[in-house]
Amino acid sequence: MKMTLIAILTCAAVLVLHTTAAEELEAESQLMEIGMPDTELEAVDEERLFECSVSCEIEKEGNKDCKKKKCKGGWKCKFNMCVKV
């Protein structure tokens, strides 16, 4: 009985991991398709812009020099915005 339960739980865990990996691969392949609108990437860009601006504004309130948030992945913070390097 214990072995059956362990086997069922193991299979369920493998199925969940496999499904998650398959979903990630599908999402990646959709982003890599040529001719697909970059709406997903535009949303990421807008999010970076917002995060950078908000971070800088919060630091200005303390009467200190604004230390801009470090933007990652080929981006840098300039004039309160994340810009592509």
From Swiss-Prot:
Entry-linked PROSITE patterns: HWTX_2
Pfam families per the UniProt record, alphabetical: Toxin_20
Pro-peptide positions on chain: 23-48
Tissue specificity comment: Expressed by the venom gland.
Disulfide feature: C52-C66, C56-C77, C71-C82
Entry's localization field: Secreted
Main localization of the protein described in the UniProt heading: secreted
One of the record's GO molecular function terms: toxin activity
Signal peptide: 1-22
SUPFAM superfamilies xref list: omega toxin-like
GO cellular component: extracellular region; host cell postsynaptic membrane
InterPro entries: Hwtx-2-like
Domain of life assignment: Eukaryota
Sorted UniProt keywords: Disulfide bond, Neurotoxin, Postsynaptic neurotoxin, Secreted, Signal, Toxin
Stated role: Neurotoxin active on both insects and mammals.
Sequence similarity: Belongs to the neurotoxin 12 (Hwtx-2) family. 02 (Hwtx-2) subfamily.
Self-association and partners: Monomer.
Protein name: U4-theraphotoxin-Hhn1a
Organism: Cyriopagopus hainanus (Chinese bird spider)
